[in-house]
Amino acid sequence: EYVINDLLKNGIISIILGRTAEKVNIKYNGKNILNKSIEKLRYQWEKTSYDLEKHQANPICIKEEIKNCYYRTIPKFYIPRELYKIINYPFSINKYKPKIAIINEEGSNGENEMAFCFLEVGFEVYNVNINDLATNRYNLNEFVGIAFVGGFSFSDVLGAAYGWYFSIVNNEKIRNQFVDFYNRKDTFSFGVCNGCQLMSLLGWIPKGITLEHNKSNRFESRYSLVRIEKSNAIMLNNMNGIEFGIWTAHAQGRIVVSETIQKGISKDKKKSMFPIKYLDDKNEITEKYPFNPNGSENGRCAVVSDNGRHFAIMPHPERCILKTQMPWIPENLDDKLNKYTHWILMFRNAYK
């Protein structure tokens, strides 16, 4: 309908030749030569790839993917009505520009996207390599915010973010800067992907939480559906209830919680500690592959500190703030959003 209207506006005559259906029906000389459902044909088309993947990844996950993808439906994205005006309304940036350090190390690759997000909402952004802290080019006491970026620091040869972690804790000058920053009451930090793994090692998110290898035993790059739940995370203020797509790209993103935490905190606190969850096509929290790309229990993909100021997430919201960065948005939401998606609200919340 949209295409036809656009063609008519431009004086182009068009004819509808047919419409898509749930079955492929091909006739020749009045006889059916093919009459099969899209699901069966898609499975036949993808079967060779699945057979190869069984030798390249965890075969249990691949079998699960075949089963779960066979009956896939269109997922529902949801943004509370009252947020549309906030997302689309020009964000008021005052003269005060808080300073944020975009922390990176050799092998990091997400600093440009992260810098753009914070620049877009009024921060004064600095690209800070760990070596800059050792040479006194910058000092963390200058900043109110830290963002640990994604990527593969030191190629993860020592384990995810371990090389980055050791470059901090094994240098007294650098280590003390991070300790002082964390202990201040006027600061916040945000870690994505490799940055999330680093925050776990530093203990900036609750101790006893580790990031382990994906159950699929391979790197996963997918467009996943997640839900934001109520928590004390300052960057998620007033965002609970949103269900939306987000990019994921990691090999070691499965959140594992120690028995001490499992037994030592209440169910409600445990729920608020992990404020973002993976969903399936029915918008239910899931551990099923590939909806949950790493197999984290109870769909967990983010974690926040007790005071709400330190927030870490495995997926990449910094790659999703613009509509043009999204591979797909339902038509009913696409029409309601202008330039930004709701993910911009995370960075606006940090500014506030």
Which stretches of residues belong to each language-model region?
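Generic beta-strand/beta-sheet core signal
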Residues: 1, 15-20, 29, 103-105, ...
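Intein/HINT protein-splicing elements and their conserved insertion hotspots or analogous self-processing inserts
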Residues: 2-99, 107
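Beta-strand->loop->alpha-helix junctions that form or flank phosphate-binding loops
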Residues: 6-30, 126-132, 210-218, 275-277
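Amide-donor transfer/coupling interface in amidating biosynthetic enzymes
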Residues: 17, 136-138, 175-180, 211-352
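Residues that mark the start of a beta-strand
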Residues: 97-99, 124, 245
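Short helix-loop-beta junction
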Residues: 112-127
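Short acidic/histidine-rich motifs immediately flanking catalytic phosphotransfer sites
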Residues: 138-147
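Cysteine-nucleophile active-site neighborhood
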Residues: 152-233
